[in-house]
C-alpha cells in the first residue's frame, strides 16, 4: 500500500471531525429549542420537594438504625452538588451533553476518560500480540510482558499518532488471522 493511500482515510476523518465541530449546536441554542428549558435545580419546585423527602427519609432511617447508602450528612452533600445541576420540571437532574465547558465534569471528562482507558487497553493488547511468539503466548499469558504492554498502553495517543500518520497502524490482509468457525 502506498503512503498516499494510507493518508486518505486519515484526511477524510479529519475533515469529518472539523465539519462536526463547525456544525455543532451550542447549549444556549439548544435551550431555546425545547418546550420546557432546563433550570438550575435549586430553582425547580419539584426538585425542592424531592430533596425534602429524601432528607427526611435519611433522617428517619438513621434514627431507626436502618442501613442506608448515605447518612444525613452524605445526603445533604449529594443535594448540594445537585443544586448546581440543571433540572427539568420533573425535579430530576439532567445530563448536559452540549459541550458547555462549565458542565464538562458531567459528561465531557468522564467520556474522554472512558475513551482513553478503552484505547489504552486496546493498544496494550495490540502491543502484546505484536510481541508474542505465537499462539502459546495468547493461551498462557506472559505476565511480565503483559504488564509492560499495559504500562506502555497508558501513553497510547503518543504512540498511535505517528503510526496513524505513517500508515504503519494498518496491517496487511495476509497477517490478519481469521478465527475458526
Swiss-Prot record:
Keyword terms: Cell inner membrane, Cell membrane, Membrane, Photosynthesis, Photosystem I, Signal, Transmembrane, Transmembrane helix
Compartments, record wording: Cell inner membrane
Transmembrane region(s): 104-124
Cleaved signal peptide residues: 1-30
GO cellular component: photosystem I reaction center; plasma membrane
GO BP terms in the entry: photosynthesis
Subunit structure: The G.violaceus PSI reaction center is composed of one copy each of PsaA,B,C,D,E,F,L,M and Z, and forms trimeric complexes.
Family: Belongs to the PsaF family.
Function: Probably participates in efficiency of electron transfer from plastocyanin to P700 (or cytochrome c553 in algae and cyanobacteria). This plastocyanin-docking protein contributes to the specific association of plastocyanin with PSI.
PANTHER family tied to this protein: PHOTOSYSTEM I REACTION CENTER SUBUNIT III, CHLOROPLASTIC
Protein name as catalogued: Photosystem I reaction center subunit III
